[in-house]
């Protein structure tokens, strides 16, 4: 990843981190609850504000949930790294945090933290099975340009 891209993206990410840090530093739990509910109760204005789940993703999550006594959610995060600058991180989780956004389709929940959400809104999450691997992937991401063939890293569209 070029240093110039990092220099252009860093101020944006730093601003988002500061904004989320202020949200998490409210002095009372009720303030956190109020702030998170007001941001999540706003109507979704378009399909680009939602993170979509493919039928394959839903099928695989239901398979995983059937073997667990407690239904887990799929958590998507974005971290720096990978061959293109940012990489997707998928985990199974049973908890949400105050700064999470939750998307649900057919009983399957996807959880995305607010900082990562800005980099994946409008994206479609899929589950791909190939000869050498099977994994959750971000199949389409309108916020990304470029990326690597493994589909786990990307560059941010500025």
Curated annotation (Swiss-Prot):
Transit peptide residues according to the UniProt entry: 1-26
Subcellular compartments: Mitochondrion
One example GO MF annotation: metal ion binding
Lineage top rank: taxon: Eukaryota
Presence of the UniProt keyword Metal-binding in the record: yes
Keyword field: Iron, Iron-sulfur, Metal-binding, Mitochondrion, Transit peptide
GO biological-process terms attached to the record: iron-sulfur cluster assembly
Co-factor binding comment: Binds 2 iron ions per dimer. The dimer may bind additional iron ions.
Database matches in InterPro entries: FeS_biogenesis, FeS_cluster_insertion, HesB-like_dom_sf
Binding annotation for Fe cation: 83, 148, 150
Required cofactor names: Fe cation
Pfam families per UniProt: Fe-S_biosyn
GO cellular component terms, A-Z: mitochondrion
Subunit (UniProt): Homodimer; may form tetramers and higher multimers.
Functional summary from the UniProt entry: Involved in the assembly of mitochondrial iron-sulfur proteins. Probably involved in the binding of an intermediate of Fe/S cluster assembly.
NCBIfam families (UniProt xref): iron-sulfur cluster assembly accessory protein
Family: Belongs to the HesB/IscA family.
Protein name: Iron-sulfur assembly protein IscA-like 2, mitochondrial
Taxonomic lineage of the native organism: Eukaryota, Viridiplantae, Streptophyta, Embryophyta, Tracheophyta
